């Protein structure tokens, strides 16, 4: 069932259930104690996506029940950050009265930040012409008196930008402000306050670690930028072109001078490290100049393939960030042949759902 209305009195119970479930699932890896990081019980999501339903003169957001596929009208959305919730209502009020903006509109996406920016993407089953551009400009001017708001219009083979296609998040991590560009249609952690807790936990892990860090699946540099100060050098890989572009932007904004990002998949990087293939994308980067004793991986829900697990197992210390306990368990079966779990944390990125974000710290066994 989609989470729309929230009874905050149930928050502690649902988190306790997750803690017990994960503790039981990973007990065989010697996990004695979980570190548990809670979320805000309401208004925690910085992004939200809705379909749009037209009913005569009426117009409203909808979601679909995951089991029955029935549509659910969404006039207010309790998980949404306050800025998203407020702008949702403002958008509906303004779209209802504008035929040009509402016609053939089928989806609205919201992306916001703790620092007060919001990007609204409007998706259409029609080409966007000069009349649409005129109306959306008028709306942007009207709303900009109160909000730091930009718009994107999307139609088939068409993208119109009214402002930027990204927001700039500013996170206070252990007293340091970190700046992150977050681009429309690119992955970012939806629960910004829990993301801060994840970054602070990772920084704590890295305090005693030395030499260099390798990160696979680095996204927009979320972890590597926060951890760069703990290491001599950081090398990070990411396959998404837009995420690599954002990571480079974020490196410059945060004045990080010891971090290199290369655009390649974990499988390709494994081939490069094993000397199986050479890549022009590695030109100017001497892999042998890095003394990486720590590796951080934050893979997609599918986890890591066997060859990547083999590569990861070569490092003294492993930080594994996971959004899927099932593939994490599978990969730990592989990694605990050579390493032992030292710390295990859960982060409630997605309250009131079965989803859970985990962080595991492993160190090589003494032989």
Swiss-Prot record:
<feature type="binding site">
    <location>
        <position position="222"/>
    </location>
    <ligand>
        <name>S-adenosyl-L-methionine</name>
    </ligand>
</feature>
<dbReference type="InterPro" id="IPR030390">
    <property type="entry name" value="MeTrfase_TrmA_AS"/>
</dbReference>
<feature type="binding site">
    <location>
        <position position="189"/>
    </location>
    <ligand>
        <name>S-adenosyl-L-methionine</name>
    </ligand>
</feature>
<dbReference type="InterPro" id="IPR010280">
    <property type="entry name" value="U5_MeTrfase_fam"/>
</dbReference>
<dbReference type="Pfam" id="PF05958">
    <property type="entry name" value="tRNA_U5-meth_tr"/>
</dbReference>
<dbReference type="GO" id="GO:0005829">
    <property type="term" value="C:cytosol"/>
</dbReference>
<comment type="function">
    <text>Dual-specificity methyltransferase that catalyzes the formation of 5-methyluridine at position 54 (m5U54) in all tRNAs, and that of position 341 (m5U341) in tmRNA (transfer-mRNA).</text>
</comment>
<protein>
    <recommendedName>
        <fullName>tRNA/tmRNA (uracil-C(5))-methyltransferase</fullName>
        <ecNumber>2.1.1.-</ecNumber>
        <ecNumber>2.1.1.35</ecNumber>
    </recommendedName>
</protein>
<dbReference type="GO" id="GO:0019843">
    <property type="term" value="F:rRNA binding"/>
</dbReference>
<comment type="similarity">
    <text>Belongs to the class I-like SAM-binding methyltransferase superfamily. RNA M5U methyltransferase family. TrmA subfamily.</text>
</comment>
<feature type="binding site">
    <location>
        <position position="217"/>
    </location>
    <ligand>
        <name>S-adenosyl-L-methionine</name>
    </ligand>
</feature>
<dbReference type="GO" id="GO:0030488">
    <property type="term" value="P:tRNA methylation"/>
</dbReference>
<keyword id="KW-0819">tRNA processing</keyword>
<keyword id="KW-0949">S-adenosyl-L-methionine</keyword>
<dbReference type="InterPro" id="IPR030391">
    <property type="entry name" value="MeTrfase_TrmA_CS"/>
</dbReference>
<keyword id="KW-0489">Methyltransferase</keyword>
<feature type="active site" description="Nucleophile">
    <location>
        <position position="323"/>
    </location>
</feature>
<dbReference type="GO" id="GO:0030697">
    <property type="term" value="F:tRNA (uracil(54)-C5)-methyltransferase activity, S-adenosyl methionine-dependent"/>
</dbReference>
<dbReference type="InterPro" id="IPR029063">
    <property type="entry name" value="SAM-dependent_MTases_sf"/>
</dbReference>
<keyword id="KW-0808">Transferase</keyword>
<feature type="binding site">
    <location>
        <position position="238"/>
    </location>
    <ligand>
        <name>S-adenosyl-L-methionine</name>
    </ligand>
</feature>
<dbReference type="GO" id="GO:0000049">
    <property type="term" value="F:tRNA binding"/>
</dbReference>
<dbReference type="InterPro" id="IPR011869">
    <property type="entry name" value="TrmA_MeTrfase"/>
</dbReference>
<feature type="binding site">
    <location>
        <position position="298"/>
    </location>
    <ligand>
        <name>S-adenosyl-L-methionine</name>
    </ligand>
</feature>
<feature type="active site" description="Proton acceptor">
    <location>
        <position position="357"/>
    </location>
</feature>
């Amino acid at each position: 069932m989609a989470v729309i209305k929230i009874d905050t009195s149930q928050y502690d119970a649902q988190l306790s259930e997750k803690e017990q479930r994960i503790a039981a699932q990973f007990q065989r890896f010697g996990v004695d104690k979980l570190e548990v990081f809670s979320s805000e019980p309401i208004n925690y999501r910085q992004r939200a996506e809705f379909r749009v339903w037209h009913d005569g003169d009426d117009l409203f957001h909808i979601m679909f029940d995951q089991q029955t596929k029935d549509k659910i009208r969404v006039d207010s959305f309790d998980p949404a950050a306050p800025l998203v919730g407020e702008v949702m209502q403002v958008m509906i009020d303004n779209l209802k009265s504008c035929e040009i903006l509402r016609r053939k509109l089928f989806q609205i996406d919201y992306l916001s930040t703790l620092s007060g920016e919001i990007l609204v993407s409007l998706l259409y089953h029609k080409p966007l012409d000069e009349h649409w551009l005129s109306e959306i400009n008028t709306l942007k001017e009207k709303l900009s008196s109160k909000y730091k708001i930009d718009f994107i219009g999307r139609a088939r083979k068409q993208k119109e930008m009214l402002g930027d296609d990204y927001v700039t998040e500013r996170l206070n991590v252990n007293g340091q402000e970190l700046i992150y560009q977050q681009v429309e249609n690119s992955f970012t952690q939806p629960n910004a306050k829990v993301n801060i807790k994840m970054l602070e936990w990772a920084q704590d892990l890295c305090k005693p670690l030395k030499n260099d860090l390798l990160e696979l699946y680095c996204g927009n540099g979320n972890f590597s930028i926060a951890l760069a100060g703990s290491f001599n050098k950081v090398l990070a890989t990411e396959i998404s072109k837009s995420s690599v572009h954002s990571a480079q932007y974020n490196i410059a904004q945060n004045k990080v001078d010891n971090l290199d990002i290369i655009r390649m998949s974990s499988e390709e990087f494994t081939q490069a490290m094993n000397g199986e293939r050479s890549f022009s994308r590695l030109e100017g980067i001497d892999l042998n100049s890095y003394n990486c004793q720590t590796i951080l991986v934050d893979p997609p829900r599918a986890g890591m393939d066997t060859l990547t697990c083999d590569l990861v197992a070569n490092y003294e210390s492993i930080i594994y960030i996971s959004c899927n306990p099932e593939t994490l368990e599978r990969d730990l079966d592989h990694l605990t042949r050579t390493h032992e779990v030292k710390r295990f944390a859960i982060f409630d990125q997605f309250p009131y759902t079965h989803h859970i974000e985990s962080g595991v710290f492993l160190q090589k066994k003494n032989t």
